[in-house]
Curated annotation (Swiss-Prot):
Sequence-type repeats, residues: 112-116, 117-121, 122-126, 127-131, 132-136, 137-141, 142-146
Superkingdom assignment: Viruses
The keyword Repeat is assigned to this record: yes
Keyword Repeat belongs to the record: yes
Induction data: Expressed in the late phase of the viral replicative cycle.
Region annotated 7 X 5 AA tandem repeats of G-[NS]-[IV]-R-[DS], chain positions: 112-146
Alphabetic keyword roster: Late protein, Repeat
Region called Disordered, residue ranges: 116-209
Biased segments, Basic and acidic residues type: 192-209
Similarity-based family: Belongs to the asfivirus B407L family.
UniProt-recorded name of the protein: Uncharacterized protein B407L
Length: 412
């Protein structure tokens, strides 16, 4: 049989070093007690249940290994062989055929004809029946009728009320329990199920992880002060890294001329929660501006495309309509500037699960579409201004108005 014990006390290694000795008896040896607890073996509850069940059966005089409790045992009251001179004598002073014969039901003890109180202690002497009979008063009607005992509903109903335990009923219950055990979970499966349910992996809180690290450190070094020093150094390094991230975000926002005066900058002495809150606020402010810029560039690029396709010279098929979208990007710029928060939210929901490479492509993609249009507008404005200056109008006010109109037209 496989060993099902496990060492639960091994998880308490080093626990005595964490205990406060102020309220502990000075004569107590904590190290010795720890060794005793760690070396103690603990069994499964199923084994403890089996031990209690066997002890209870022993106190009641029940032996589960007795053939009497098997389904194949003969239908007799006493299954043990009689000890004595002959086979007619029975164990304990009762003859085998004197109690359960053909005239009396073999499935019960004296059903109907012998009551539970008819045979009393002391009525059978010397372990045998004198003169082959039982004295009067011990059995009602003076004797047991052979081959003439009536078997009917009345006798059977009276046997149910007898205080004597019917072995046929016991065999029936035992057979039902045997059948139910075949469909039940085996003992090994119950133990495995118990182990998996009790010791399944659960979510570990940070405080639990810290306790585990402390116990592992005590097992290796045994000095709790050095562990706390390492924990303090680790927390300090984490704060320095996060403070550097805050400085980088402040630099980015300063280059974009975004104010951060309302945010209190933490120091190395600030708590970790305060530092995390500042990082979250600066990150939201930074990505909000970036995401709104991405949305503006994409929508303005689409407006530029409509201006190129529908400039008033092309006709839409089947509609006989020539739309002119020249200068649409200026209208888009004004509208999008008022909706920077909404556009940043839309882009933020789209890019939150994107990889860094995809974000870079999304940032540079609209610029590839807008750059040719910007260069073309710049060259056209320079050419118009150069031609106007070469013309040299006589009236300076007329020249100024023409230059102003040319620049205004090219900026559309």
């Amino acid at each position: 049989m496989e060993d099902t014990t496990f060492l639960e006390g091994a998880n308490l290694a080093g626990i005595t070093t964490l205990m406060n000795n102020l309220h502990i008896n000075e004569q107590a040896n904590l190290e010795e007690l720890e060794k005793q607890v760690m070396g103690k073996q603990q069994s499964f509850p199923t084994d403890h249940f089996d031990e209690e069940l066997n002890g209870l059966a022993k106190s009641l005089g029940i032996n589960f290994n007795d053939p009497e409790f098997s389904l194949d045992a003969a239908h007799s009251v006493i299954s043990k062989k009689p000890s004595g001179r002959g086979s007619d004598k029975v164990h304990g002073g009762i003859r085998r055929d004197s109690v359960c014969t053909d005239s009396i039901c073999s499935d019960s003890v004296c059903s109907g004809s012998i009551r539970s109180g008819s045979i009393r202690s002391g009525s059978i002497r010397d372990g045998s029946i004198r003169d082959g009979s039982i004295r009067s008063g011990n059995i009602r009607d003076g004797s047991v009728r052979s081959s003439k005992t009536r078997r009917g509903p009345a006798r059977n109903s009276s046997s149910r009320n007898d205080r004597g335990y019917s072995l046929s009923t016991h065999r029936k219950k035992y057979a039902e329990s045997e059948a139910s055990q075949k469909t039940a979970i085996s003992k090994r499966d119950r133990k495995n199920h118990y182990a998996e349910s009790e010791y399944s992996e659960k979510s570990i809180k940070p405080s639990t992880k810290q306790v585990d690290r402390l116990i592992n450190h005590l097992r290796s070094n045994g000095d709790p002060n050095s562990f706390y020093k390492k924990e303090h150094d680790y927390e300090r390094k984490t704060k320095l890294v996060k403070l550097e991230k805050i400085n980088m975000l402040l630099t980015y926002l300063g280059n974009e001329q975004i104010s951060t005066d309302d945010i209190k900058i933490p120091t190395i002495d600030s708590s970790m929660q305060e530092i995390d809150d500042v990082i979250e606020m600066l990150t939201l402010r930074n990505v909000g501006i970036r995401y709104s810029s991405i949305a503006e560039e994409i929508l303005i690029g689409l407006a530029r495309g409509l201006e190129i396709v529908f400039d008033g010279t092309r006709e839409i098929p089947f509609l006989n309509y020539r739309p002119d979208y020249t200068g649409l990007h200026n209208t888009f710029m004004i509208k999008l500037f008022k909706m920077r928060y909404e556009t940043s939210q839309v882009v933020g929901n789209l890019v939150q699960n994107m990889s860094p490479l995809s974000k870079i492509c999304l940032e540079l993609g609209p610029s590839l579409l807008l750059y040719p249009a910007l260069i073309r507008t710049k060259h056209k404005a320079s050419e118009d201004l150069y031609n106007l200056l070469q013309k040299g109008p006589e009236d300076p006010f007329t020249a100024y108005n023409e230059i102003h109109e040319t620049l205004k037209k090219n900026n559309k």
